[in-house]
UniProtKB/Swiss-Prot annotation:
One GO BP: protein transport
UniProt keyword list: Protein transport, RNA-binding, Transport
Protein name (Swiss-Prot/TrEMBL): Nascent polypeptide-associated complex protein
Gene3D superfamilies: DNA helicase RuvA subunit, C-terminal domain, Nascent polypeptide-associated complex domain
SMART domains: NAC (SM01407)
Membrane as UniProt keyword: no
Domain NAC-A/B as annotated: residue spans: 5-73
Annotated function: Contacts the emerging nascent chain on the ribosome.
Signal peptide: none
Top-level taxon in the UniProt lineage: Archaea
Record HAMAP family: NAC_arch
Encoding gene, per UniProt annotation: nac
Length: 119
C-alpha cells in the first residue's frame, strides 16, 4: 500500500522498482486531438510519458479548448491522367465524358470504355 505522504523521490524509486519509467516531455507546448467533428486543443501542455510493460501512456495537463471543424466541401474525384487519356482515345469521347464514365465505373478504365461503347 502506498502511504498518504510520499515525496517525489520515493515515488520515482518505487516506480523504478516496478519497472515503470516516467519522462517529462519539456519540449511539448501544445497537444491536438483530431476528431471527426471537432478538434481538442490543449495549450500550455505539460506532457508526461509513462512506460510500463512496453506500453507508452501519455498524461497531458493544460488548458483545453474545442475547435469545431467546418464541413469540408466534397472533394472532386481525381483519376490518373493516363486512365482519362486511355478512355478518351479508346471510346472517342471528350475529357468530360471520360471522367464521367470513370466515376460511373468506380475508376476502372476498362469498364468505363465498355460502358461508353455500349451507348
Amino acid at each position: 500500500m502506498i502511504p498518504g505522504r510520499m515525496n517525489s523521490r520515493e515515488m520515482r524509486r518505487l516506480m523504478a522498482q516496478m519497472g515503470i519509467k516516467s519522462t517529462e516531455m519539456d519540449d511539448v507546448t501544445k497537444v491536438i486531438f483530431k476528431g471527426k467533428t471537432k478538434d481538442y486543443v490543449i495549450d500550455n501542455a505539460q506532457v508526461t510519458m509513462i512506460e510500463a510493460q512496453g506500453v507508452k501512456t501519455f498524461q497531458v495537463v493544460g488548458t483545453m479548448r474545442e475547435v469545431p471543424k467546418e464541413p469540408e466541401e466534397k472533394k472532386e474525384e481525381s483519376f490518373p491522367e493516363d486512365d482519362i487519356k486511355l478512355v478518351m482515345e479508346q471510346a472517342s469521347v471528350s475529357r468530360e465524358k471520360a471522367i464521367e464514365a470513370l466515376k460511373a465505373s468506380g475508376g476502372e478504365p476498362a469498364q468505363a470504355i465498355m460502358n461508353l461503347m455500349q451507348k
